[in-house]
């Protein structure tokens, strides 16, 4: 299991990406070290009962380098390695109330980009109730509140034709200043836009073939609908099958090359043995010839000495 930061609200894990970003992890001092209390006090993390400070029993508690100031590290050697100083204490932590408020907002907030239907209906009802001649002024709506459905907002050209958008001139609405220029622009666009023969060709004219007709239709890869959320995801089974087949083919080819190299080595060994045997025979023949010559010289010397005597 990879190391992770134990600070409240910190989700940093010891991965290749974090190491490339220069984030390091440092273990919590042991219980006999006086700096342990400072680390836990600055962490502001409560125990499971919520009464006192957090005092873990595990020896594998780490804090990432994002909770330390820059002056807490020192440069070691020429490799650029940053080491934590002996008396360093983590001081950069988010307050507990801020973390709770963030978690509450994330838990009860609406996801961005997806409007709530009931919220839109209530907003439209409030907008319709506020419309009237006695209303002096209505503040503009907030940017995060959408008072119109998505269908009407996505097609502004159809707003002038909608009966819900047409308002009486005597009524005041917080959206009248927005709908007026929008409706005028839509009317001008509708009047200026006229069908042309270039935009609507006759069906009798021959159309050129689409390039997509000549393209190869490839099926989607296996598991394409699965979202890749982790770096250790399995991936496409077809791709892994092709890789396995390629690896098996490469293994078969390597084995054939190995067998051929072994046969070549055996032939070279046999040839070397024959050459060594021929060399040994030549050496023995030369030794025999020298011995024979030596014997002949000795016999000739003996005959010569006997004849002179």
From Swiss-Prot:
Q: Which UniProt keywords apply?
A: Chromosome, DNA-binding, Metal-binding, Nucleus, Phosphoprotein, Transcription, Transcription regulation, Zinc, Zinc-finger
The GO biological-process annotations, alphabetized, read as: negative regulation of transcription by RNA polymerase II
Q: Where in the cell is it found?
A: Nucleus; Chromosome
Per the record, GO CC terms? chromatin; nuclear membrane; nuclear speck
Tell me which domain of life the UniProt entry assigns to the organism this sequence originates from. Eukaryota
Which residues lie in Pro residues bias regions? 198-209
Q: Can you list the disulfide-bonded cysteine pairs?
A: none
Signal sequence residues: none
**ZnF region ranges: THAP-type:** 1-93
Any one GO molecular function term:
DNA binding
Task: Write down which residues bear the modification named Phosphoserine.
Answer: 162, 210
Note down the stretches annotated as region Disordered: 176-210
Where on this chain is HCFC1-binding motif (HBM) (motif)?
A: 229-232
The record's subunit annotation is:
Forms homodimers. Interacts with HDAC3 and nuclear hormone receptor corepressors. Interacts via HBM with HCFC1.
Function description: Chromatin-associated, histone tail-binding protein that represses transcription via recruitment of HDAC3 and nuclear hormone receptor corepressors.
* Stated name of the protein: THAP domain-containing protein 7
> Taxonomic lineage per UniProt?
Eukaryota, Metazoa, Chordata, Craniata, Vertebrata
What gene is it encoded by? Thap7
């Amino acid at each position: 299991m990879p190391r992770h930061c134990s600070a409240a609200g910190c989700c940093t894990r010891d991965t290749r990406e974090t190491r490339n970003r220069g984030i390091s992890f440092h273990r919590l001092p042991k219980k006999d070290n006086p700096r342990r209390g400072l680390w836990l006090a600055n962490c502001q993390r409560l125990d499971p009962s919520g009464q006192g400070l957090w005092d873990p029993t595990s020896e594998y508690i780490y804090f990432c380098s994002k909770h330390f100031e820059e002056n807490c590290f020192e440069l070691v050697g020429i490799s650029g390695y940053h080491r934590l100083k002996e008396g360093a204490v983590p001081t950069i932590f988010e307050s507990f109330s801020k973390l709770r408020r963030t978690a509450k907002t994330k838990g009860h907030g609406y996801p961005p980009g997806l409007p709530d239907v009931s919220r839109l209906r209530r907003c439209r009802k409030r907008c319709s109730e506020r419309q009237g001649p006695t209303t002096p002024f209505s503040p503009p709506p907030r940017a995060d509140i959408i008072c119109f459905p998505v269908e009407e907002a996505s097609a502004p050209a159809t707003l002038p034709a909608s009966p819900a958008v047409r308002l009486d001139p005597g009524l005041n609405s917080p959206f009248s200043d927005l709908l007026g220029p929008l409706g005028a622009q839509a009317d001008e666009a509708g009047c200026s836009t006229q069908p042309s023969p270039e935009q609507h060709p006759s069906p009798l004219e021959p159309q050129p073939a689409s390039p997509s007709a000549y393209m190869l239709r490839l099926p989607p890869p296996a598991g394409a609908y699965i979202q890749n959320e982790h770096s250790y995801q399995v991936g496409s089974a077809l791709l892994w099958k092709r890789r396995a087949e390629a690896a098996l083919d490469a293994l078969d080819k390597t084995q054939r090359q190995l067998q051929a190299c072994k046969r070549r080595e055996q032939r070279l060994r046999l040839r070397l043995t024959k050459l060594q045997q021929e060399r040994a025979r030549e050496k023995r023949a030369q030794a025999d010839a020298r011995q024979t010559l030596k014997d002949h010289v000795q016999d000739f010397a003996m005959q010569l000495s006997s004849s002179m005597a």
